[in-house]
Amino acid sequence: MVYSYTEKKRIRKDFGKRPQVLDIPYLLSIQLDSFQKFIEQDPEGQHGLEAAFRSVFPIQSYSGNSELQYVSYRLGEPVFDVKECQIRGVTYSAPLRVKLRLVIYEREAPEGTVKDIKEQEVYMGEIPLMTENGTFVINGTERVIVSQLHRSPGVFFDSDKGKTHSSGKVLYNARIIPYRGSWLDFEFDPKDNLFVRIDRRRKLPATIILRALNFTTAQILDLFFEKVVFEIRDNKLQMELVPERLRGETASFDIEANGKVYVEKARRITARHIRQLEKDGIDRIEVPVEYIAGKVVAKDYVDASTGELICAANMELSLDLLAKLSQAGHKQIETLFTNDLDHGAYISETLRVDPTSDRLSALVEIYRMMRPGEPPTREAAENLFENLFFSEDRYDLSAVGRMKFNRSLLRDEIEGSGILSKEDITEVMKKLIDIRNGRGEVDDIDHLGNRRIRSVGEMAENQFRVGLVRVERAVKERLSLGDLDTLMPQDMINAKPISAAVKEFFGSSQLSQFMDQNNPLSEITHKRRISALGPGGLTRERAGFEVRDVHPTHYGRVCPIETPEGPNIGLINSLSVYAQTNEYGFLETPYRRVRDGVVTDEINYLSAIEEGNFVIAQANSNLDDEGRFLEDLVTCRSKGESSLFSREQVDYMDVSTQQIVSVGASLIPFLEHDDANRALMGANMQRQAVPTLRADKPLVGTGMERAVAVDSGVTSVAKRGGTVQYVDASRIVIKVNEDEMHPGEAGIDIYNLTKYTRSNQNTCINQMPCVNLGEPIERGDVLADGPSTDLGELALGQNMRVAFMPWNGYNFEDSILVSERVVQEDRFTTIHIQELACVSRDTKLGPEEITADIPNVGEAALSKLDESGIVYIGAEVTGGDILVGKVTPKGETQLTPEEKLLRAIFGEKASDVKDSSLRVPNGVSGTVIDVQVFTRDGVEKDKRALEIEEMQLKQAKKDLTEELQILEAGLFARIHAVLVSGGIEAEKLSKLPRERWLELGLTDEDKQNQLEQLAEQYDEMKSEFEKKMDAKRRKITQGDDLAPGVLKIVKVYLAVKRQIQPGDKMAGRHGNKGVISKINPIEDMPYDENGTPVDIVLNPLGVPSRMNIGQILETHLGMAAKGIGEKINAMLKKQEEVAKLREFIQKAYDLGDNVCQKVDLSTFTDDEVLRLAENLKKGMPIATPVFDGATEKEIKELLQLGGLPTSGQITLFDGRTGEQFERQVTVGYMYMLKLNHLVDDKMHARSTGSYSLVTQQPLGGKAQFGGQRFGEMEVWALEAYGAAYTLQEMLTVKSDDVNGRTKMYKNIVDGDHRMEPGMPESFNVLLKEIRSLGINIELEEE
């Protein structure tokens, strides 16, 4: 494998045995591709904004004299960039401008004669844009639109599985679900009649809809039944015989023909009898007259002479009717063929309960059902029915729906109209009846072929269309009202409804969520999440067990492990690593093609529907060098089941062992040795890890760490190769390689880094460069590490030396004992940044003022404020300190004469304002790292605001000037090269000032052209700089657009440093979570023979019952990795020659059985080997991919190489007594995470606080400064102890006895510690509640 210079700094030893056939795809593509589809111009108009416009336009006036046509649209440039939007709290969006054409037709002239055409570009609101990391900035906060898994449009056949009716009879139903429009359901009732429902309303006999479609009774019977023809000849009745129809019947008479008896009376007709009849070619037999009684006529029979109806279609025949028919000269009688086995008379029965007789009465019935209480007219009824399923405005199956519909009905073509046709409805009914008759299967609703993904783009398009439809109504009215000659398209369109619909979706839809920004993994997982909830989806309460369950089609598409615990389990899933959506929105997963038992490198993506027809081998099947299966029988999946197949039968093979899991689960090493429940917790808890101060790469990883770190967007990645020209904490400058440059550019890339910003979860986002000056860079190399990344690899926690042993009960019930060394070394210290805002409003009594002049506040409290009343940057503040001084005017109170006198004497004016300053919340202490002041346009800026503005201008100028200088230097270097190659001496050039170089002329024409091109570019660059500077200045100095009534907003950012402490929650990656019980002095921790103490002591009893053995294997492998690191460290300290070092490291990389990774250190220079060794001395990082990891044998070999016992256990000594422990203890390195459940955020005690309005009891919870609830069971406990006085004060003065508690306060102030309990308020509430039920209760005095 070829490594770039940067990748050679630290190479992770990979134990994977299977070669990587397919690179891991870009992990955020589901979001970015979907949104790209939404905003890019689509000439076909199949999706995105284009489709929405084309579906609504052209809009015609009611009279048809004019119409508004859509021409094209364009998105403008956003006003602010992403960072500015976050700071200012605005939405990152671009204006949408649409070109519309108003066409006015001549009134009297023939149709289509154009009188006037006006074209104009119209503003249609703002469209939020996606940032490059797949998020949206809405009102300054980053949000993610989660993809939705919903039922695909189309037709579904299902049954109630016998649950509806008490008899347990299975009732079948069919449902046509459009993308938008009314649902159409067909269902059987227990009596086997077929009913129809529209939009889940009252049911009607299904034949009503057929009558509404203009079918007559005879046509309906013709559609659904086969015919049996009886002939009357010579007063004898003959029946046309189709032998196959007789199977399974019992003969009610002797079946004979040509004098031969084929079946005797009362015998069952078998396949042998049928073969005999067919062989002899018998096509009609004589039947007794009674046989026809009870049969149903297929059409109307009329007496030709009188025109009288003898027998209507669907009537049962009797012997009388037969005689009448015979008299009227009808010799042939068509009846319906039905039997109880597989030709039920369902439609015939339904027609009997159908109250309607013709189209009109059917339409009226449907109208009454849809609009009860409205008088139906013929026109209204026709319109309603027409609009339900046959109008393109109201009904759309969509391309997906039509494809699914046609596939379900086994039609050949997959395209077609978006509305329903007569055939569609009748074929659905036919198929439903076939299923009831025992032919065909019901669909599995949880099959991923019947559920599809709706991503951002599609949902935004739907919302946009909703907005457009609202506008359409208004436009129609304007077109028919006004004076068209003076109207322009702009006057028709009101952008408000459109932007309101879009804003509502991005701001408050259930699927638009506040981004989980704890760490890079939680961001990536959030963007790849798939939810079955949301508008048009399921609800938590109604979702049954089946929907939540893992389905065989989830394989490779949806992760079976990662899903939340609790009420949402199984409803919110995560996309598998390699999964993607196809054009219809169904999930696909890649497979390698297998031909004649040989696995090729051809890769096909299959959806769940396509996959069902193939035999698919697992990724860990053994292959020889040519890719042929070694075993004759291979374990494969087919039609959702797993079994053995011969190698010739195999069609496909999995691409990778990680294919079935999501990104989160693929980061758990030895996942294959963990119980699924614990793996679920492990995958979920990794997302809650807080980025530590110093990120530390996991010693034992899975090889996915780099992909996650790079794709998440928290690192800075090189867009083009080159060399590092300049690097500091906030900027990296790369001089681009010649071959990657565009002609005529300076060839300089500048990467500005993010410094100490707040994330959505209040953790700290900070980037640090990880390249040095002069280093060669290749495209895709990581230049700067973000939060929780280390040299471009995800690093969520720290590698800790753990021992599995009990220690004095401090690790009882999953508690964790931690060494003080962990705190001293700041291993789990995290930085949290809080934003506190102070808003100054315009009140009725006058404006609030931000000032340092606050009434009744001492000097000390104001010591950290500047003269504007805003805290200094760098000030260390604690709970209760003032951050921003603010006073609010209060209403004039009536003054007593004494007060008036005092006022007159001392001139005190401050008492007409009250202090409403922003203070640090209790329990928080930290350092102020940033202050921002936003001032409304037209309000004078205070001194601090001007200072900040000045500083920002200075910084912007400095940045842009430096950028210009860097670009100029690059450009002049190229000019210099051109001039020297053109024959001018370098010495002479150095004497000329650089600006004059451009004036020189060259004889060589090509060179002169080059020079002119560069000169042109130089001018362009300078004017560009001026433009940028002007724009920057404008943005910084302009006032801010604040909410109505707000004059000023001051935002203060506090950085809080939190060390680990008892009560914090920690976890490993295998679901092994616990709370820190004690931080133990280093000298008391158990230590080994070398005197090295362990960092953490875990309880061994937490392993066997939880069955997450992965943590033990990780511990052993971590120990081996550390052992090898220590050996390398010893060699470096001894300053061994590079050859020895190279040999040892090579040995470590080569270890393992037929491992794929090949690292050839002979191609590395000595410097590169030394740098690699330097990065490996803390431990050699190891990758053990999911389901393809290190074996026990390999772990033992690695332990041996590191000079450690192969048992993985060592002798430990007690730190307090120095005595050896009885038996050896498992010690090793485990990757531990500190989770975002910190005791500081949870600890809370109430003093005096607010009370609930109704019950007058203290509120609950930290946010409300609430109390601890003394609940029902606690009361029982006190009752059981007989602690009457304690109980009394709990239920009265400490809770809701209003008078009692004020009296008690007064008593305590007076130094008298008695209490006088009264009536608890909750008792009054109870009385009121009983009275509200009409029962009068009164309290009587004794």
From Swiss-Prot:
Gene3D superfamilies: 2.40.50.100, 2.40.50.150, 3.90.1100.10, DNA-directed RNA polymerase, beta subunit, external 1 domain, DNA-directed RNA polymerase, subunit 2, domain 6, RNA polymerase alpha subunit dimerisation domain, RNA polymerase Rpb2, domain 2. SUPFAM superfamilies: beta and beta-prime subunits of DNA dependent RNA-polymerase. GO terms for cellular component: DNA-directed RNA polymerase complex. It comes from the Bacteria. GO terms for biological process: DNA-templated transcription. Keywords: DNA-directed RNA polymerase, Nucleotidyltransferase, Transcription, Transferase. Pfam families: RNA_pol_Rpb2_1, RNA_pol_Rpb2_2, RNA_pol_Rpb2_3, RNA_pol_Rpb2_45, RNA_pol_Rpb2_6, RNA_pol_Rpb2_7. Disulfide bonds: none annotated. Its EC number is 2.7.7.6. CDD domains: RNA_pol_B_RPB2. The keyword Electron transport does not apply. It catalyses: RNA(n) + a ribonucleoside 5'-triphosphate = RNA(n+1) + diphosphate. The RNAP catalytic core consists of 2 alpha, 1 beta, 1 beta' and 1 omega subunit. When a sigma factor is associated with the core the holoenzyme is formed, which can initiate transcription. DNA-dependent RNA polymerase catalyzes the transcription of DNA into RNA using the four ribonucleoside triphosphates as substrates. Belongs to the RNA polymerase beta chain family. PANTHER family: DNA-DIRECTED RNA POLYMERASE I SUBUNIT 2. This is DNA-directed RNA polymerase subunit beta. It comes from Yersinia pestis. The lineage of its organism: Bacteria, Pseudomonadati, Pseudomonadota, Gammaproteobacteria, Enterobacterales. The gene is rpoB.
